[in-house]
Amino acid sequence: MASPAAAELYAAQGWDTVTLDLEHGSIGFDAAVEILRAIRGSGVVPLVRVPKGDPTWVATLLDAGAMGITAAMIDTREDAQRLVDACRYPPLGDRGLSRQTRAAMLHGLDYTETANTRISVFAMVETVEGMRNLSSIASVLGLDGIYFGGVDFEMSLRRAARGDPAGAGDTAAATASARKAVVEACRANSILAGMNAANPAAALALFESGFRFITLSSDAVAMTSQARAWVTDARNLVTAKV
């Protein structure tokens, strides 16, 4: 949600990291900076998800204090290399240098020397093309991990079969196979496999299958599901007394 206050409260609930979603969230840059401040003020690592690894977005958000980038729709090795180049200072990348950014001022004069080890970089693989190029993407030096977008991968399977409703086949089985492939590719390259879990039980299942960077639902889902449960319980309790 586009609210620094909500982000601050959410971040204070014991999370290791909180990700600000600029791919699907209706959040502008000014609001994003305030939300990053709120997350960091709660002692939590602030991460940002960006569309397609846009270099301008990436550089600006890192300068504003984001401690990690997860870039959507990374389909090729070239996409992954552009992402790393935007996130890493030389010699690992091409990130531009300024010692007067918020990030540099927060982390001290040695920020540019330490940022390459402090910043996390995840490439989202979530299409048929991305899975086809998984091995070459995962081998890009400077990536910390591959984040698998299971929902978009299923959509990609359906798009690939456009005009042939049966052509997508068993999308659930194909997605399960892709999840396994992501874990194997990450292990082969000594990087982390990541994915979102809808609930704690799903998070455990991902962990047991080899995922080590696991995000859990969202602030909007947490708020609405809890509110819905309270309303339902209250109505049921009152109805039982009538």
Regions found by a protein language model. Name each.
Residues M1-V242:
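Expand to "…catalyze enediolate/carbanion chemistry for C-C bond making/breaking, isomerization
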